[in-house]
Amino acid sequence: MYYGFDIGGTKIALGVFDSGRQLQWEKRVPTPRDSYDAFLDAVCELVAEADQRFGCKGSVGIGIPGMPETEDGTLYAANVPAASGKPLRADLSARLDRDVRLDNDANCFALSEAWDDEFTQYPLVMGLILGTGVGGGLIFNGKPITGKSYITGEFGHMRLPVDALTMMGLDFPLRRCGCGQHGCIENYLSGRGFAWLYQHYYHQPLQAPEIIALYDQGDEQARAHVERYLDLLAVCLGNILTIVDPDLVVIGGGLSNFPAITTQLADRLPRHLLPVARVPRIERARHGDAGGMRGAAFLHLTD
């Protein structure tokens, strides 16, 4: 059996998958915030419960935000303070007496989608998350591309391209990002960015679901806003596609539930690509909340 953990700031979620990559059992517990020992105990207790339930010693893969393993072997994960700065992989491998594999949670999302039965035909899969932030991952021939610093796929921290500023106006504000830079596309293309753009142009503080509801009702202002957002997304994604040239782009995160994102994006891309470039297939993520656990479990299938 393959155990996949999706660990975030508030929850530790475990999914157990069989050899057919089907979910057999899952359980969630709160993430301890202050005690590293309590954090390790929470993970180990879930593994012990799964081992007992299924009568085997399952493999363990973990998806977690941040850098799973820095040069000194420690985890960097600001959203998981109890474990950040600790040698998490080594400690869990020792306590569980098995090889524990860690990767960035966005890479696990992309891996889950790349291993979907419908998508395994595509050699190069790009996962794009449009949620609280903007991120993603790259999967080549069924294996995640992590890079030296585990930051492959940190698309949200690319800066707005010149074409975007031309389209939005040269006086468009370059917002300061949590990473310390200015103009990162995450500040405009995430769910919060979607809402910020609306407030910037229309001076109304609405959340993304409220704007989308207005769009569905035919509200002209909301429709104009969505058109602007999609144009901005196409400009930014065009730059990424010129570098990566994937066969498939799978979009996840809260905004992926808005059909216009996946149905109206492809037609906007050619003007931002080289004339010989082919627009990749663009699809909504198939596995929802289980995607992180699923991809983490499959880290042991990538050898």
Curated annotation (Swiss-Prot):
Transmembrane segments: none annotated. It comes from the Bacteria. Belongs to the ROK (NagC/XylR) family. NagK subfamily. Zn(2+) binds at H157, C177, C179, C184. It is an enzyme of class 2 (transferase). ATP binds at residues 4-11, 133-140. It catalyses: N-acetyl-D-glucosamine + ATP = N-acetyl-D-glucosamine 6-phosphate + ADP + H(+). The gene is nagK. Catalyzes the phosphorylation of N-acetyl-D-glucosamine (GlcNAc) derived from cell-wall degradation, yielding GlcNAc-6-P. Has also low level glucokinase activity in vitro. GO terms for biological process: N-acetylglucosamine metabolic process; peptidoglycan turnover. The keyword Chloroplast does not apply. One of its GO terms (molecular function) is ATP binding. It comes from Escherichia coli (strain K12). This is N-acetyl-D-glucosamine kinase. Keywords: ATP-binding, Carbohydrate metabolism, Kinase, Metal-binding, Nucleotide-binding, Transferase, Zinc.
